Amino acid sequence: IKFQYSVKHEVKRVINTIETRTWLISNGYRFSLPQGLQDSQSSESESIRELIQKEYNKDLYEVAEKAISKSWNGNCKLIKEINEKLVDSHNLDELNVILTKYGTQGSYTQPNSIIVNVSAIPPEFLISTVVHESIHLMIEPLIKKNDVDHWVKERIVNLIIDLEFKSRFKMSPVPEWVVSVDGVFKQYYPNLELIMKKAPHVPS
C-alpha cells in the first residue's frame, strides 16, 4: 500500500468533483469543495489552487495515513483472500491510496488507485472506505464487461464486504429495486459473472 497527497492532487480532485457535480447530486451523493469556491472559478485551476492552499494542512493527511496503515496491516490478509476467492477478479497486487479532503467519501481509478476523503469520517474508520474501493477495483473489469448498473455494482460490493467482514461495516443505502440482487448473490457467490448476468436492471 502506498500513499500520496499534495496540493496538486487536491486541485485535480476538486476539478473532477465540479465536473461530475450534476451526476453526484442527482444520485444523492454528498461531497465537499473548498470554502469560498464560486461557480465562476469552477474551471480556473489557479484560483482553485489558491483556495486549497489556504486550507491545506499536512497533519490531516499524515494522521489519516498512519491510521489507515495500522488498520491495513490487520486486514490485508483477508483482503487478499477475498481477491483470490472472487472468480475472475482483477488481481490487486498493490494499492495506491490518494488522500483528499474534497469530493465524495471515496472513489477508484483502474487499475490500482483509490481516493479516500480524510475529512468526512474519523481516521480510525477510514479503513472502511479503503476496503470498499479496493473491492471495486477487483470487480470493475467484470462490471464493465457485463454492463452492470451503478447501484447494482454498489450493492454487490456491499454484500461482499458484509459477508466477508461479518457485518463489521455499515452497508450504504441503495434504491429499493436493487435489493433483489441479494438473493442472486447468496445463490452464486463468489461467481461474480453469474451474479452480474442474473442481477436486476434499472426499472423502465
Each model region followed by its residue ranges:
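N-terminal low-structure segments adjacent to metalloprotease catalytic domains
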Residues: I1-K70
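Post-HExxH zinc-binding segment in Zn-dependent metallohydrolases
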Residues: K2-Q4, K8-E10, I143-F185
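Auxiliary, metal-adjacent structural segments of Zn-dependent hydrolase domains
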Residues: I52-Q110, P123, L163-V174
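Short His-Asn-centered micro-motif
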Residues: I98-Y102, V116-A120, E133
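Short pre-active-site segment immediately N-terminal to the catalytic Zn-binding motif
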Residues: I115-T129, V148
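Active-site recognition of the HExxH zinc-binding catalytic motif
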Residues: S128-P141
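Pan-zinc metallopeptidase signature
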Residues: V174-S204
